[in-house]
Amino acid sequence: MKQLPITEARAFNVSYNGLVNVLVSDIGISSPFQGPPPPDITQKQYKAIWDTGATNSVVTRAIVNDCGLQPTGVTTVKTAAGERLANTFLVAIWLPNHICIPSLRVTEGIIGGGIEVLIGMDIIIRGDFAVTNTEGKTNFTFRMPSLRCIDFVKESPPTVIFEGQTVRVPSRSDPCYCGSGKKYKRCHGK
C-alpha cells in the first residue's frame, strides 16, 4: 500500500445535530485504475456506513448493477447472520477528503437502511479515525494517511470521581485527595 507524503494528507469531518449510533458519509465509486486517475473517469455517489467491526468493505447488488461491475472471484464472508459465499469486485473508492483508493477488493452484500456501501477496516486502517460525542452531538473525522497517534489518556490528566466531584489523580507521593493526611500510594492509590 503506497502511503502519501505527509504534505498530502487530507481529512474530512461529519457532524450530526445529536447523538447517532451509525456513522454515514458520502463516497464515490468508479471503475478501478492504476496510476493517476484517467481524465474520463466517472464516479457515482453513494451513502456509506463506516464500520470498525467489518474487516473488509462491502457494496450492494444495486451498486454492482449501477456501475456494471464484473465479479473477480468468490470468497467466504462471515457476518452476524453466519458464513456465506459472496462475489468479489475491484472498485475505486473516492473518500470525502478527495483521496481515492484506486483498486480495492470489495465483496457484495446486503447492508440495508438506504446504505449502499460499507467502509470496513481495510480502508480505516489507512488513516486516523476518531469519533467524539461532545455536547450531545456526534462527530466523526478521518484523515489519510495517518499522521499521529490519537490517545485520549495522554491528552487528559488522570482524574477520579470522589464524593461527586472530579479530582486530578495525585502522584503516588502526593497527599491523598480524601484528606486523610496519608500519601496517596498508602491510601486510595493502593
Explain the meaning of each model-derived region:
Residues 1-177, 184-190:
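Pepsin/retropepsin-fold aspartyl endopeptidases
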